[in-house]
C-alpha cells in the first residue's frame, strides 16, 4: 500500500508555507472539517464566500500584508477561485489547479454530452422530484462517492479518481468522494449560475494549470480562452499544461512531483510584490 499522503488542501498550503508564504487551508462549507448544515451541499454563492471569508480573516492578522494576498483553488474550487478573482479586488494573484467549471459540468454533463435544453430539463425534473423525497424523509439522499470496487470497463477518469480517493493517496473517513458522495441535489444550483461569466474582467494575475492527459483539461483550456478574450488585462494571465499529468496528479503530485511548486512560488512572488 502507498504511504499515506497529506490531503489536497494541506499539500498545497504546507508546501507554500515551507517556501515562505503564510497560508491558510480550509474545506468548503458543509464538507470535511468545515461546519454548516445540511452536509454535503455545494453552493456557488456560499463557496465563493468561503474564499472571501478567508481573505477577511487573513486581512486582520498583524503579520499579513493586505496588499499581498493570493488564493489557490483546486478541482471544482479552481473554477470558483476564478469567480472570486473576478469579484474580490483584494486578491492580487489566483491559481486554479486541475479545475472544473462546475456550472458547465452540472448543466452540460461530462464532455458536454448533455448540452441540450431537453437533457437539462430531464435532470431538473429528476432532482426536483428528489428534493420532495428528501423533504418527506427528513434527510438527504447521497449520490454515492467514487465507485468501489472499480469495474473493469470503468472510464479512464473514474479509474483516476479511484486511484486517489479509494487508496491511501487520498482516502479520508470524512471525504465525501471517498465515501457516500455529495447529496443527489447537492450541486443542482450550479446549473443556473454561470460562475465564469465575468472572468474576462479579472484584472489581477491568474494562472490556470492542468494536466495534459486529464479528462478535465478542456475546462482549463476553455476557461483561459474566455478569461483573456477582450480582456485589456490579459498580459498577466497564463495557462500552464503539465506534460503527461492526469487530473489527480495535481492533487498530490501523483508520485512524480507533478505539481509545479517552483512555478507557483515564482508566480505569487512576482505578482504579490
Regions found by a protein language model. Give the residues of each.
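Short beta-strand/loop motif that positions the catalytic acidic residue
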Residues: 202, 208-210
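Alpha/beta-hydrolase-fold enzymes
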Residues: 82-166
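Catalytic histidine-centered segment of alpha/beta-hydrolase-like enzymes
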Residues: 245-257
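Alpha/beta-hydrolase active-site loop
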Residues: 41-62
